[in-house]
Design a protein with these regions (language model features):
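Signature of N6-adenine DNA methyltransferases within the class I
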Residues: 1-96
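Polybasic, glycine- and aromatic-enriched phosphate-binding surface used to engage nucleic acids
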Residues: 76-258, 262, 266-281
Length: 282
């Protein structure tokens, strides 16, 4: 039995491994169980044989298979203390996460450039933008439609939900890029097919008080993006990680919903969400 003792994040992704961009963390374990807080540092490569080590802080590592919350910068130390007190997750708000059902290269014969009788819009990750949902299939190998047989109804999404890109990098301004798939677009087209590089955050029917636009606002907030960066260690934005993000309490989420209903400016709502995480923003 061992316990994490030290964790070093390698700041560079380029040049660590040949011909690949790979985020790397070096972890040292100590035999046995101990109560010493693990030391987290960043390791900045300085050529082939040298590196600068910058201490970030000491943290308690979650036990029992729970998600590790690790600071990426010094300012995250206090932030993590708040995160660890936040017990609400997407499931507590009545939402589940699944991966887009369509692996496109398994259905090549059904892809269409024009809409036919049995066609549905095929939603790619490029349709999720910082300005919201914008149906698009402009990138290489992307087409806008797919024919669906009567036996493939499971591929079709017919209810409003929040779509999240499954692949982003730490260099991007936002690791979580989400957009509402509007019910109006679904009703107009009869449904859509969501490609596999997208996560679908949908109401599971167990609790319906929180609307999708509120979940969208939360996931796109700067402070939730910061929390996600303390969880994620790769370019993948997995369903497991989305389900692990600490979120405000139900009462606080309903307060956010009330602010949206009142037409309050997004900047004020961002400030309110940040406050729930103990973060002050201008």
């Amino acid at each position: 039995k061992t316990t994490p003792y030290a964790l070093d994040f390698v700041t560079d992704r380029d040049g660590v491994f040949d011909d690949v961009l790979q985020e790397t963390m070096l972890t040292a374990f100590k035999a046995g169980e101990h109560k010493v807080r693990a030391q987290v540092s960043s390791l900045v490569p300085k050529g082939l044989n040298k590196a600068k080590i910058e201490k970030i802080g000491n943290v308690d590592i979650e036990k029992g298979g729970a998600t590790w919350l690790l600071p990426r910068v010094k300012d995250d130390a206090c932030f993590l203390n708040v995160l660890k007190q936040m017990s609400t997750r997407l499931a507590d708000l009545g939402y589940s996460v699944s991966t887009g059902q369509l692996v496109w290269n398994r259905f090549k014969s059904q892809l269409r450039t024009t809409k036919g009788k049995n066609s549905y819009p095929l939603v790619w990750a490029e349709s999720i933008t910082s300005a919201g949902f914008r149906f698009s299939a402009d990138r290489k190998n992307h087409v806008p439609y797919i024919d669906i047989t009567p036996q493939q109804g499971f591929l079709v999404t017919k209810s409003e939900c929040v779509l999240v890109q499954r692949t982003t990098s730490k260099e991007q301004d936002r690791r979580i890029l989400a957009a509402i798939l509007p019910q109006g677009f679904i009703d107009e087209t009869g449904g859509v097919v969501v490609e596999n590089h997208i996560n679908i955050v949908y109401s599971n029917g167990l609790f319906s008080a929180v609307r999708p636009d509120v979940i969208d606002m939360l996931l796109n907030s700067h402070v939730v993006d910061r929390a996600f960066r303390c969880i994620s260690g790769s370019v993948a934005v997995s369903a497991y990680e989305l389900n692990s993000i600490p979120l405000p309490s139900l009462e606080q989420v309903m307060e956010i919903q009330s602010l949206i209903d009142a037409g309050v400016h997004r900047r004020i709502i961002e400030r309110t969400i940040a406050g729930f995480y103990g973060v002050m923003i201008a």
